[in-house]
Amino acid sequence: MIAPEKLLEAAKALEPQLQEWRRTLHRHPEVGFDLPQTKALVKKALTEMGYTPQDCGKCGVVALAGGKRPGKVILLRGDMEALPLQEESGEEFSSELPGKMHGCGHDMHTAMVLGAAKLLKEHEDEIEGTVKLEFQPAEEIFQGSLDMINSGLLENPKVDAAVMFHVLAGMPLPAGMVLVPGGGITMASCEQYHIVVHGKGGHGSMPNACIDPITAAAHIHIALQEINSRELDPAGFGVFTTGRFEAGKTSNVIPDSADMWGTIRTVDPEQKVSALIHQRMTEIAQGVATAYRCTAEVEFSDYCPCMVVDTPLAGNALTYMTELLGKEAMDMTPLTGGKPGGGSEDFAFVSHEVPTVSMFLAAGNAKEGYTYGQHHPKVRFDDSVLYRGTAAYTYMALRWLAEHQ
């Protein structure tokens, strides 16, 4: 098997190509499952490397490396889609599409896995098993991973272990550092909620002749905070946030309805906390609405489970990343105290099916000029770390397969 230092050199030599892939994707961001240009770039690159990429699900792509020697199967995931966000980063390769931006670094992930695909193809005879390369859409809406699983992602050949990386910007970490979590739940579950409050609209000068849904919705929003502060265990983790509130279109008209959208996050795999939040949100929304002569509908959707990291696989990952990067790979447990993060990731669906590890790659901090974090319109990512991500994906696959015959 190729030595770690030689692999890093080979990955470093790919840097111009990695940056070209990443910056092309960054200029042309696409969201959700609607990724025609992104998918075309991925399939073209894979085909030119000698792969036969296959469609998987609504918009996913998979390809296989190795398979010439018997062994297990390891999955490497790169998500592809952008956010519905207006870019303000100031990068020379900023989004050319209004209202769309690679603000979470998925362009980086796609480029890194394409780089790994190239290195794996060049060392295909050394692969003791099979590497399945996954390019996933719709992570941001928590639908892409499950769609690909339902379309056979983990079968033919059957996957034995799964790996993902996520870049981090704006964190106080040296660029290029790899963080490996311990085992157990590392990220929260997430689901969407939508509350519609129905009243009776009319002229703003005659509120007495109307039933104002805005007033009712505002009181519902305030009343819901009691669930967080008075009904959930302070020692646990359960939080919901209303991030969008819409009502009316004109300043002098009381509308017929008001809408609220938000997210619920917990770290309870049995969903008991989620069930309590569902019950109490519905009771409070409908009860407060009634008090203000309105009605309320509450809907929950797009559930994504907690991310569960396999403890033995995480141990393998820390060993391999240390072999590759030395002190620039670290156990992130001292940073987190072993507690799950509040963010969510739909690769969690895979983690409930096969042993999985989700790692992080630092891609710029404030001292280096990378001030903003993910999902901010001004976020920037240091793409000089791409080769490290490519090397990390590649080494993880080769090393794990060699050790798990």
Feature names for model-found ranges:
Residues 26-28, 102, 106-109, 166, ...:
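Histidine-centered active-site/metal-ligand motif
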Residues 77, 86, 193-195, 358-364:
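Non-cysteine beta-strand/loop elements that form the S-adenosyl-L-methionine
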Residues 25, 63, 76, 106, ...:
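Divalent metal-coordination and catalytic microenvironments
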Residues 85-92, 184-189, 317, 364-373:
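Short, flexible, mixed-charge acidic loops at enzyme active sites
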Residues 83, 90-101, 108, 120-255, ...:
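Histidine/acidic-residue-rich, glycine-tolerant segments that coordinate divalent metal ions
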Residues 2, 218-405:
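Metal-dependent amide/peptide-bond hydrolase catalytic core
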